[in-house]
C-alpha cells in the first residue's frame, strides 16, 4: 500500500521508477539522488499510523495525492474496469530497482486487464497527453519491474474554488439536485 511506513522503507532502499530519471540527468540531479539515498529515511509520523493516509501539504505532490483517488474512480467509471493499488516491489533480477504504480487494472473481464495506470494530477500546466521525460522514464521502469506491457498515462486537472459563487461564475454550469 502506498504512503505507509513499509512503502517509504522499500522506496528508500531502491532506485524507484519515479526517481530513476535523476540517474540519467545532469550532475546536479545525479548528486540529488545520491544525497537522497545516503541520508536516513524520513517516514512521516502519519505514515506510521495504520488508518491515517499521509498527505504532506507542504510539497508539490499534495495536489496529486489529494486527487488521485478521484482520478482512479473516474478512470474506472469511464473505462468500466477496476483498478487495484499495489505497493513498491523490487525488480525480480535487480533488487536495487523498484516500482509502485498508481494502479493496475485487475478486472479480468476488462480489455484493460493487466494494464498499469500512472496518474498525474496537474495544477500549473496544460494537459497534452504527452508525458514529460521523467514520467516516460518512470512508466518504462514500472513496466519492466512489474513485467507488464502497457501503461495508461492519465492526466487530470481538478480546479478548486473558494466559494460556490466562484464556481458558477467560471462558466455556464447547471446545478444538479
Label every PLM stretch briefly:
Residues 1-70, 160-162, 175-176:
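Charged, glycine-rich intrinsically disordered N-terminal tails and low-complexity linkers that flank
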Amino acid at each position: 500500500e502506498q504512503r505507509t511506513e513499509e512503502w517509504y522503507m522499500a522506496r528508500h532502499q531502491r532506485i524507484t521508477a519515479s526517481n530513476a530519471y535523476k540517474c540519467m540527468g545532469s550532475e546536479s540531479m545525479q548528486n540529488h539522488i545520491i544525497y537522497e539515498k545516503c541520508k536516513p529515511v524520513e517516514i512521516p509520523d502519519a505514515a506510521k499510523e495504520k488508518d491515517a493516509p499521509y498527505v504532506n501539504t507542504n510539497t508539490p505532490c499534495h495536489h496529486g495525492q489529494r486527487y488521485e483517488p478521484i482520478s482512479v474512480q473516474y478512470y474506472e467509471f469511464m473505462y468500466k474496469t477496476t483498478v487495484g493499488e499495489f505497493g513498491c516491489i523490487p525488480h525480480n533480477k535487480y533488487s536495487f530497482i523498484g516500482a509502485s504504480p498508481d494502479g493496475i487494472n485487475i478486472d479480468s473481464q476488462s480489455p484493460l486487464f493487466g494494464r498499469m495506470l500512472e496518474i498525474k494530477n496537474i495544477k500549473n500546466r496544460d494537459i497534452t497527453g504527452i508525458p514529460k521525460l521523467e514520467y516516460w522514464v518512470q512508466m518504462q521502469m514500472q513496466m519492466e519491474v512489474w513485467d507488464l506491457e502497457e501503461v495508461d498515462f492519465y492526466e487530470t486537472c481538478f480546479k478548486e474554488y473558494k466559494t460556490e459563487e466562484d464556481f458558477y461564475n467560471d462558466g455556464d454550469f447547471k446545478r444538479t439536485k
